[in-house]
Amino acid sequence: MNPNFLDFEQPIADLQAKIEELRLVGNDNSLNIGDEIARLQDKSSTLTEDIFGKLTSWQIARLARHPRRPYTLDYIQHIFTEFDELHGDRHFSDDAAIVGGIARLDDQPVMVIGHQKGREVREKVRRNFGMPRPEGYRKACRLMEMAERFKMPILTFIDTPGAYPGIDAEERNQSEAIAWNLRVMSRLKTPIIATVIGEGGSGGALAIGVCDQLNMLQYSTYAVISPEGCASILWKTAEKAPDAAEAMGITADRLKGLGIVDKVIAEPLGGAHRDPAAAAATIRGELASQLAMLKKLDNEALLARRYERLMSYGL
Protein backbone atom coordinates (compact mmCIF):
# COMPACT_ATOMS: atom_id res chain seq x y z
CA MET A 1 0.00 0.00 0.00
CA ASN A 2 1.33 3.42 -0.98
CA PRO A 3 1.84 5.42 2.26
CA ASN A 4 0.99 8.65 0.44
CA PHE A 5 -2.56 7.38 -0.14
CA LEU A 6 -5.17 6.37 2.43
CA ASP A 7 -7.00 3.06 2.01
CA PHE A 8 -10.05 4.63 0.35
CA GLU A 9 -7.69 6.31 -2.14
CA GLN A 10 -6.05 3.06 -3.28
CA PRO A 11 -7.85 2.95 -6.66
CA ILE A 12 -6.29 6.37 -7.33
CA ALA A 13 -2.91 5.09 -6.14
CA ASP A 14 -3.13 2.13 -8.52
CA LEU A 15 -3.78 4.43 -11.49
CA GLN A 16 -0.92 6.72 -10.49
CA ALA A 17 1.38 3.71 -10.27
CA LYS A 18 0.41 2.70 -13.83
CA ILE A 19 1.08 6.24 -15.05
CA GLU A 20 4.55 6.25 -13.47
CA GLU A 21 5.27 2.81 -14.93
CA LEU A 22 4.35 4.01 -18.42
CA ARG A 23 6.55 7.06 -18.03
CA LEU A 24 9.50 4.87 -17.11
CA VAL A 25 8.85 2.57 -20.08
CA GLY A 26 8.62 5.57 -22.39
CA ASN A 27 11.89 6.99 -21.07
CA ASP A 28 13.68 3.67 -21.57
CA ASN A 29 12.42 2.92 -25.07
CA SER A 30 11.77 6.37 -26.53
CA LEU A 31 8.17 5.34 -27.16
CA ASN A 32 5.42 7.88 -27.68
CA ILE A 33 2.90 6.86 -25.04
CA GLY A 34 1.69 10.35 -24.25
CA ASP A 35 -1.88 9.61 -25.36
CA GLU A 36 -2.19 6.63 -23.03
CA ILE A 37 -0.73 8.61 -20.13
CA ALA A 38 -3.15 11.47 -20.80
CA ARG A 39 -6.05 9.00 -20.86
CA LEU A 40 -5.03 7.52 -17.52
CA GLN A 41 -4.55 10.98 -16.02
CA ASP A 42 -8.07 11.95 -17.06
CA LYS A 43 -9.36 8.70 -15.60
CA SER A 44 -7.47 9.40 -12.36
CA SER A 45 -8.95 12.91 -12.10
CA THR A 46 -12.47 11.59 -12.69
CA LEU A 47 -11.99 8.83 -10.12
CA THR A 48 -10.61 11.32 -7.58
CA GLU A 49 -13.60 13.62 -8.10
CA ASP A 50 -15.94 10.68 -7.57
CA ILE A 51 -14.23 9.46 -4.39
CA PHE A 52 -13.78 12.90 -2.87
CA GLY A 53 -17.31 13.92 -3.78
CA LYS A 54 -18.80 11.50 -1.25
CA LEU A 55 -16.33 11.36 1.64
CA THR A 56 -17.65 10.38 5.06
CA SER A 57 -16.86 12.42 8.18
CA TRP A 58 -14.41 9.73 9.28
CA GLN A 59 -12.59 9.79 5.96
CA ILE A 60 -12.28 13.58 6.23
CA ALA A 61 -10.91 13.17 9.76
CA ARG A 62 -8.24 10.85 8.39
CA LEU A 63 -7.42 13.29 5.58
CA ALA A 64 -6.98 16.03 8.18
CA ARG A 65 -4.24 13.88 9.74
CA HIS A 66 -2.58 12.87 6.46
CA PRO A 67 1.20 12.61 7.04
CA ARG A 68 1.95 14.64 3.89
CA ARG A 69 -0.55 17.40 4.65
CA PRO A 70 1.03 20.90 4.77
CA TYR A 71 1.76 22.21 8.25
CA THR A 72 1.97 25.77 9.56
CA LEU A 73 5.60 26.30 8.53
CA ASP A 74 4.81 25.06 5.02
CA TYR A 75 2.07 27.65 4.66
CA ILE A 76 4.26 30.37 6.15
CA GLN A 77 6.87 29.65 3.49
CA HIS A 78 4.31 29.94 0.68
CA ILE A 79 2.09 32.76 1.96
CA PHE A 80 4.31 35.23 3.81
CA THR A 81 7.60 37.02 3.33
CA GLU A 82 10.26 38.13 5.81
CA PHE A 83 9.15 35.67 8.50
CA ASP A 84 11.15 36.14 11.69
CA GLU A 85 10.39 33.41 14.22
CA LEU A 86 10.22 34.39 17.89
CA HIS A 87 10.84 31.97 20.75
CA GLY A 88 10.04 31.45 24.41
CA ASP A 89 7.29 32.34 26.85
CA ARG A 90 9.57 34.38 29.19
CA HIS A 91 8.40 32.18 32.08
CA PHE A 92 9.64 28.61 31.58
CA SER A 93 10.90 27.64 28.12
CA ASP A 94 10.21 27.49 24.41
CA ASP A 95 7.68 25.00 23.04
CA ALA A 96 8.33 23.78 19.50
CA ALA A 97 4.72 22.60 19.14
CA ILE A 98 3.76 26.28 18.70
CA VAL A 99 5.59 28.44 16.17
CA GLY A 100 5.13 32.15 15.76
CA GLY A 101 6.71 35.34 14.60
CA ILE A 102 6.46 38.52 12.60
CA ALA A 103 5.99 38.34 8.84
CA ARG A 104 4.53 40.28 5.94
CA LEU A 105 1.37 39.54 4.02
CA ASP A 106 1.94 41.66 0.93
CA ASP A 107 3.12 44.93 2.55
CA GLN A 108 1.21 44.41 5.80
CA PRO A 109 3.20 43.37 8.91
CA VAL A 110 1.36 40.56 10.69
CA MET A 111 1.89 38.23 13.63
CA VAL A 112 1.66 34.60 12.52
CA ILE A 113 1.11 31.85 15.11
CA GLY A 114 0.33 28.18 14.61
CA HIS A 115 0.64 24.60 15.76
CA GLN A 116 3.48 22.64 14.20
CA LYS A 117 3.68 18.86 13.89
CA GLY A 118 6.72 16.96 12.67
CA ARG A 119 7.51 14.89 9.58
CA GLU A 120 10.32 12.59 10.69
CA VAL A 121 10.52 10.74 14.01
CA ARG A 122 12.95 13.14 15.70
CA GLU A 123 11.01 16.18 14.60
CA LYS A 124 7.72 14.61 15.72
CA VAL A 125 9.21 14.14 19.18
CA ARG A 126 10.68 17.65 19.25
CA ARG A 127 7.34 19.12 18.20
CA ASN A 128 5.53 16.78 20.62
CA PHE A 129 3.31 15.66 17.72
CA GLY A 130 1.74 19.12 17.59
CA MET A 131 0.44 18.97 21.18
CA PRO A 132 1.47 22.16 23.02
CA ARG A 133 2.39 22.40 26.67
CA PRO A 134 1.50 25.49 28.76
CA GLU A 135 4.67 27.29 27.68
CA GLY A 136 3.50 27.01 24.07
CA TYR A 137 0.26 28.79 24.80
CA ARG A 138 2.03 31.37 26.96
CA LYS A 139 4.43 32.01 24.09
CA ALA A 140 1.45 32.49 21.79
CA CYS A 141 -0.11 34.88 24.29
CA ARG A 142 3.11 36.89 24.52
CA LEU A 143 3.25 37.23 20.75
CA MET A 144 -0.40 38.23 20.52
CA GLU A 145 0.04 40.95 23.13
CA MET A 146 3.10 42.14 21.21
CA ALA A 147 0.99 42.27 18.05
CA GLU A 148 -1.59 44.44 19.79
CA ARG A 149 1.13 46.75 21.09
CA PHE A 150 2.55 47.27 17.60
CA LYS A 151 -0.87 47.32 15.90
CA MET A 152 -0.29 44.15 13.86
CA PRO A 153 -3.14 41.82 12.84
CA ILE A 154 -2.90 38.25 14.16
CA LEU A 155 -3.19 35.24 11.85
CA THR A 156 -3.33 31.80 13.48
CA PHE A 157 -3.12 28.33 11.94
CA ILE A 158 -4.77 25.53 13.90
CA ASP A 159 -3.57 21.93 13.54
CA THR A 160 -3.38 19.89 16.75
CA PRO A 161 -4.79 16.67 18.21
CA GLY A 162 -5.19 18.69 21.42
CA ALA A 163 -3.25 20.21 24.27
CA TYR A 164 -0.65 17.87 25.76
CA PRO A 165 -2.26 15.87 28.63
CA GLY A 166 0.97 14.86 30.37
CA ILE A 167 1.72 15.27 34.07
CA ASP A 168 4.37 17.95 33.46
CA ALA A 169 1.86 20.04 31.52
CA GLU A 170 -0.69 19.75 34.32
CA GLU A 171 1.95 20.68 36.89
CA ARG A 172 2.57 23.91 34.98
CA ASN A 173 -1.18 24.61 34.85
CA GLN A 174 -2.26 23.69 31.33
CA SER A 175 -5.90 24.64 31.89
CA GLU A 176 -4.95 28.09 33.20
CA ALA A 177 -2.74 28.76 30.18
CA ILE A 178 -5.58 27.91 27.80
CA ALA A 179 -8.16 29.88 29.78
CA TRP A 180 -5.87 32.91 29.95
CA ASN A 181 -5.45 32.88 26.18
CA LEU A 182 -9.22 32.82 25.72
CA ARG A 183 -9.51 35.85 27.98
CA VAL A 184 -6.71 37.77 26.31
CA MET A 185 -7.78 37.01 22.74
CA SER A 186 -11.36 38.09 23.41
CA ARG A 187 -10.07 41.57 24.34
CA LEU A 188 -7.20 42.19 21.93
CA LYS A 189 -7.58 45.45 20.02
CA THR A 190 -6.34 44.09 16.72
CA PRO A 191 -7.93 41.88 14.03
CA ILE A 192 -7.61 38.12 14.53
CA ILE A 193 -8.14 35.56 11.77
CA ALA A 194 -7.92 31.84 12.59
CA THR A 195 -7.65 29.09 9.99
CA VAL A 196 -8.01 25.38 10.75
CA ILE A 197 -5.60 23.63 8.38
CA GLY A 198 -5.78 20.07 9.74
CA GLU A 199 -6.98 18.83 13.11
CA GLY A 200 -8.76 21.29 15.38
CA GLY A 201 -8.59 19.38 18.64
CA SER A 202 -10.50 20.66 21.67
CA GLY A 203 -9.06 23.34 23.98
CA GLY A 204 -5.67 22.87 22.38
CA ALA A 205 -7.11 24.38 19.22
CA LEU A 206 -9.37 26.91 20.91
CA ALA A 207 -6.42 28.45 22.78
CA ILE A 208 -5.35 30.16 19.55
CA GLY A 209 -8.79 30.11 17.97
CA VAL A 210 -10.72 33.04 19.48
CA CYS A 211 -11.06 35.31 16.47
CA ASP A 212 -12.98 37.74 14.31
CA GLN A 213 -13.00 35.38 11.32
CA LEU A 214 -12.79 31.58 11.45
CA ASN A 215 -11.80 29.64 8.34
CA MET A 216 -11.57 25.90 7.84
CA LEU A 217 -9.91 24.09 4.98
CA GLN A 218 -12.28 21.79 3.14
CA TYR A 219 -10.80 18.60 4.60
CA SER A 220 -10.01 19.81 8.11
CA THR A 221 -11.89 19.03 11.34
CA TYR A 222 -12.80 20.93 14.50
CA ALA A 223 -14.15 19.15 17.59
CA VAL A 224 -14.13 18.96 21.39
CA ILE A 225 -12.67 15.44 21.28
CA SER A 226 -11.31 13.04 18.68
CA PRO A 227 -13.76 10.56 17.12
CA GLU A 228 -11.79 7.73 18.75
CA GLY A 229 -12.02 9.40 22.15
CA CYS A 230 -15.74 9.99 21.79
CA ALA A 231 -16.31 6.40 20.68
CA SER A 232 -14.30 5.07 23.62
CA ILE A 233 -16.52 7.01 26.02
CA LEU A 234 -19.90 6.31 24.43
CA TRP A 235 -19.39 2.80 23.02
CA LYS A 236 -16.38 1.65 25.05
CA THR A 237 -14.47 0.94 21.84
CA ALA A 238 -12.52 3.10 19.40
CA GLU A 239 -13.83 0.95 16.54
CA LYS A 240 -16.97 3.08 16.59
CA ALA A 241 -14.94 6.15 15.59
CA PRO A 242 -16.65 6.43 12.16
CA ASP A 243 -20.06 6.60 13.87
CA ALA A 244 -18.76 9.14 16.38
CA ALA A 245 -17.29 11.33 13.64
CA GLU A 246 -20.64 11.45 11.87
CA ALA A 247 -22.59 12.17 15.05
CA MET A 248 -20.23 14.90 16.27
CA GLY A 249 -20.41 17.06 13.16
CA ILE A 250 -16.68 17.72 12.95
CA THR A 251 -16.37 18.70 9.28
CA ALA A 252 -16.09 22.17 7.79
CA ASP A 253 -19.40 22.02 5.94
CA ARG A 254 -21.31 20.86 9.03
CA LEU A 255 -19.77 23.57 11.19
CA LYS A 256 -20.45 26.20 8.54
CA GLY A 257 -24.10 25.17 8.63
CA LEU A 258 -24.12 25.62 12.41
CA GLY A 259 -22.76 29.15 12.10
CA ILE A 260 -19.48 28.36 13.87
CA VAL A 261 -17.27 28.65 10.79
CA ASP A 262 -17.32 31.74 8.58
CA LYS A 263 -15.56 30.39 5.50
CA VAL A 264 -14.82 26.95 4.10
CA ILE A 265 -11.69 27.23 1.95
CA ALA A 266 -11.63 24.82 -0.99
CA GLU A 267 -8.64 22.51 -1.33
CA PRO A 268 -7.01 21.20 -4.52
CA LEU A 269 -8.47 17.98 -5.91
CA GLY A 270 -7.35 15.17 -3.61
CA GLY A 271 -6.51 17.46 -0.68
CA ALA A 272 -4.00 20.17 0.18
CA HIS A 273 -1.13 17.67 0.26
CA ARG A 274 -1.56 17.01 -3.48
CA ASP A 275 -0.73 20.63 -4.33
CA PRO A 276 0.48 22.62 -1.29
CA ALA A 277 1.37 25.68 -3.38
CA ALA A 278 -2.14 25.92 -4.81
CA ALA A 279 -3.69 25.41 -1.37
CA ALA A 280 -1.47 28.16 0.05
CA ALA A 281 -2.39 30.54 -2.78
CA THR A 282 -6.09 30.07 -2.03
CA ILE A 283 -5.55 30.67 1.69
CA ARG A 284 -3.44 33.73 0.95
CA GLY A 285 -6.20 35.28 -1.14
CA GLU A 286 -8.80 34.68 1.56
CA LEU A 287 -6.59 36.10 4.32
CA ALA A 288 -5.84 39.24 2.32
CA SER A 289 -9.53 39.79 1.56
CA GLN A 290 -10.68 39.17 5.13
CA LEU A 291 -7.95 41.33 6.60
CA ALA A 292 -8.90 44.23 4.34
CA MET A 293 -12.49 43.93 5.58
CA LEU A 294 -11.56 43.79 9.28
CA LYS A 295 -9.13 46.71 9.04
CA LYS A 296 -12.06 48.96 8.13
CA LEU A 297 -13.45 48.52 11.67
CA ASP A 298 -12.29 50.71 14.54
CA ASN A 299 -11.34 49.03 17.84
CA GLU A 300 -14.74 49.57 19.43
CA ALA A 301 -16.59 48.04 16.49
CA LEU A 302 -14.07 45.19 16.24
CA LEU A 303 -14.45 44.22 19.91
CA ALA A 304 -18.23 44.56 19.80
CA ARG A 305 -18.35 42.28 16.75
CA ARG A 306 -16.08 39.74 18.45
CA TYR A 307 -18.15 39.80 21.65
CA GLU A 308 -21.36 39.28 19.70
CA ARG A 309 -19.75 36.39 17.87
CA LEU A 310 -18.68 34.68 21.10
CA MET A 311 -22.06 35.18 22.76
CA SER A 312 -23.89 33.69 19.77
CA TYR A 313 -22.49 30.20 20.37
CA GLY A 314 -24.69 27.59 22.01
CA LEU A 315 -28.42 27.46 22.53
Swiss-Prot record:
Keywords: ATP-binding, Cytoplasm, Fatty acid biosynthesis, Fatty acid metabolism, Lipid biosynthesis, Lipid metabolism, Nucleotide-binding, Transferase. One of its GO terms (biological process) is fatty acid biosynthetic process. The keyword Transferase applies. Residues 39-293 form the CoA carboxyltransferase C-terminal domain. It is found in: Cytoplasm. It catalyses: N(6)-carboxybiotinyl-L-lysyl-[protein] + acetyl-CoA = N(6)-biotinyl-L-lysyl-[protein] + malonyl-CoA. GO terms for cellular component: acetyl-CoA carboxylase complex. Pathway: Lipid metabolism; malonyl-CoA biosynthesis; malonyl-CoA from acetyl-CoA: step 1/1. Its EC number is 2.1.3.15. It holds the Pfam family ACCA. GO terms for molecular function: acetyl-CoA carboxylase activity; ATP binding; carboxyl- or carbamoyltransferase activity. InterPro entries: Acetyl_CoA_COase_a_su, ClpP/crotonase-like_dom_sf, COA_CT_C. Belongs to the AccA family. HAMAP family: AcetylCoA_CT_alpha (MF_00823). Component of the acetyl coenzyme A carboxylase (ACC) complex. First, biotin carboxylase catalyzes the carboxylation of biotin on its carrier protein (BCCP) and then the CO(2) group is transferred by the carboxyltransferase to acetyl-CoA to form malonyl-CoA. Acetyl-CoA carboxylase is a heterohexamer composed of biotin carboxyl carrier protein (AccB), biotin carboxylase (AccC) and two subunits each of ACCase subunit alpha (AccA) and ACCase subunit beta (AccD). This is Acetyl-coenzyme A carboxylase carboxyl transferase subunit alpha.
